[in-house]
Regions:
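Nucleotide phosphate-binding/pyrophosphate-handling subdomain across enzymes
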Residues: 2-9, 19-29, 289-395, 413
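Short beta-strand "acidic-cap" motif of Rossmann-like dinucleotide-binding folds
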Residues: 32-37, 140, 167, 249, ...
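C-terminal helical cap/extension that packs against the catalytic core
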Residues: 48-52, 384-441, 480-488
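Extended acidic/charged loop-beta regions that coordinate divalent cations
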Residues: 57, 63-66, 159-196, 233-291, ...
């Protein structure tokens, strides 16, 4: 085990999920840990109890840290980069590490890292399943909320033996404080406006791009065709500089310049191309699977499968396990999750849809008529893009709730869409959507917004949606055996 933190004094700032894991792991590694949180102790009583159970004495309520005694400060991703406690540490020449930087420094197993605005969790879980199917002991960690299958990255790094693999979902906030972080394989799935309340567009792009910062020339940097072919790619390069690593690409069409490292799809199938040593099978037609064999709905999930497949291939996984998972994986909770069928109406929970790009892809994934429940706190970008998605994607009716409901409604009416209702609670929204839906329709929770105005988090929002649907008599928890949601 890495000894960098042994007998060192380390302040851990932010006592939520990742900060508590840092306290636990760094204490186990022999560090003298000082837990710190700016909130009063009474507001974080459970966290205080957890660190005290480790034998640690927390500093809370904005009390001062003694920077002179610190060897390191490890910050949680929820702490803003401009927070005084971090900037004071920088001014005092205390090394500030993000949780993923600390995790990388103690990790014995290789890390395969994924970032992007949307699709990170689904891709991470897909990749994890591909590695497991290949017989590799796999840990999934980072900025991921997917039931019981994931953990903070520092805990995964601590637990994983050298022969294992760690799949890491990485946010832009986590990438703000890296210096030596160098994953074995890194992927950037997509970039669209998000977190405008905390980062400018330029800051957001620069943070995402840092996932490739320390890769060497022969190490895989996996990028979507969406990024490579758009105007923004040139802007990204202007902001952050070109990628030094070996670019692998994935997307809609085959690209000759990536003829030995490209994954693509067409209307019939998914294809995966690699160097001959990677791809000894079917060299003339590198078919991964037919599209009809894929269980996940939506073109965005086709791209998630391709990204995970490329990462697995780059890591040395044979095609068999990759194909097995590509054709059997049924999804992740709160991501286009089938809930029930009531009176011929399907209910789909996509509570993780928290921005405009995810909203558009959610609607595109379900071409049937649908009643959409949306709203919350819009995180940035042009709200008119939500209206455009509604107008062109067979939305029978829109039920809005939350802080940004007036703005979304105004944008939709300006675009000529009028079938809109307002709800004060999610339960009321489900009731209204049910009344508006017809047999064969889908009621889709796709908020396009953050949840904190009405819910604890997006998981709480999704759970409440499922609970509301579950109260209807005759709700079937099993999806139908035929059609788009068969075997899901």
């Amino acid at each position: 085990m890495h000894t960098e933190f042994n007998n060192k004094t380390v302040a851990v700032v932010g006592l939520a999920r990742s900060g508590l894991a840092c306290c636990e792991v760094l204490t186990a590694l022999g560090a003298h840990v000082i837990p710190y949180d700016g909130k009063p102790a009474g507001d974080i009583a459970e966290a205080v109890a957890e660190v005290e159970a480790l034998g640690l004495t927390p500093i809370t309520g904005g009390a001062a840290l003694d920077y002179g005694q610190l060897d390191y400060l490890v910050t949680s991703p929820g702490v803003r980069r401009d927070a005084a406690v971090l900037q004071d540490a920088v001014a005092a020449n205390v090394p500030v590490l993000g949780e993923i930087e600390a995790a990388y420094r103690i990790a014995r197993a290789p890390i395969l890292a994924i970032t992007g605005t949307n699709g990170k969790t689904t891709t991470a879980v897909l990749l994890g399943e591909m590695l497991k199917a290949a017989g590799i002991e796999t840990y999934i960690g980072g900025n991921i909320a997917a039931g019981d299958i994931a953990m903070p990255l520092i805990k995964a790094a601590y637990l994983a033996p050298p022969e294992a693999a760690i799949v890491a979902e990485i946010s832009s906030f986590q990438l703000e404080w890296i210096s030596t972080f160098r994953p074995k394989v890194a992927a950037l799935l997509n970039i669209s406006p998000d977190h405008g309340d905390r980062q400018t567009w330029e800051e957001y792009v620069a943070a995402k791009w840092r996932i490739f910062e320390n890769l060497l020339e022969d190490e895989p940097a996996i990028l979507s065709e969406e990024i490579l072919e758009t105007r923004e790619y040139g802007e990204f390069i202007e902001v952050v500089g070109d990628i030094q690593a070996a670019v692998w690409a994935f997307g809609r069409d085959k690209r000759a310049e990536f003829n030995d490292r490209y994954a693509w799809y067409d209307e019939y199938a998914l294809y995966l191309v690699g160097k001959p040593e990677f791809m000894p099978w079917m060299p003339d037609l590198p078919l991964l699977c037919k599209r009809s064999e894929v269980k996940l709905p939506g073109l965005h999930n086709i791209e998630n499968i391709l990204a995970a497949a490329e990462m697995a291939l780059a890591f040395g996984v044979e095609p068999g396990p990759i194909r097995l998972v590509a054709t059997t994986f049924t999804g992740v909770v709160h991501r286009l999750e089938y809930v029930a069928t009531v009176g011929g109406v399907r209910y789909i929970n996509n509570s993780m849809c928290t921005n405009a790009a995810a909203f558009e892809k959610s609607l595109e994934a379900l071409p049937e008529p649908k009643v959409v429940i949306a709203g919350g706190v819009f995180k940035g970008g042009d709200v008119a893009t939500l209206a455009e998605a509604v107008v062109k994607n067979n939305v029978r009716a829109l039920v809005l709730m939350g802080r940004s409901a007036p703005d979304i409604e105004a944008a939709c009416r300006a675009a000529g869409y009028e079938t809109i209702q307002r709800a004060g609670t999610l339960q009321e929204a489900v009731s209204q959507a049910t009344a508006l839906a017809q047999p064969g329709d889908t009621v889709l929770l796709a908020p396009a917004c953050a949840s904190f105005d009405m819910f604890r988090d997006f998981e709480d929002r999704g759970d409440q949606f499922k609970a509301a649907v579950g109260t209807y008599p005759g709700a079937s928890a099993d999806p139908p055996e035929t059609g788009r949601w068969a075997a899901r």
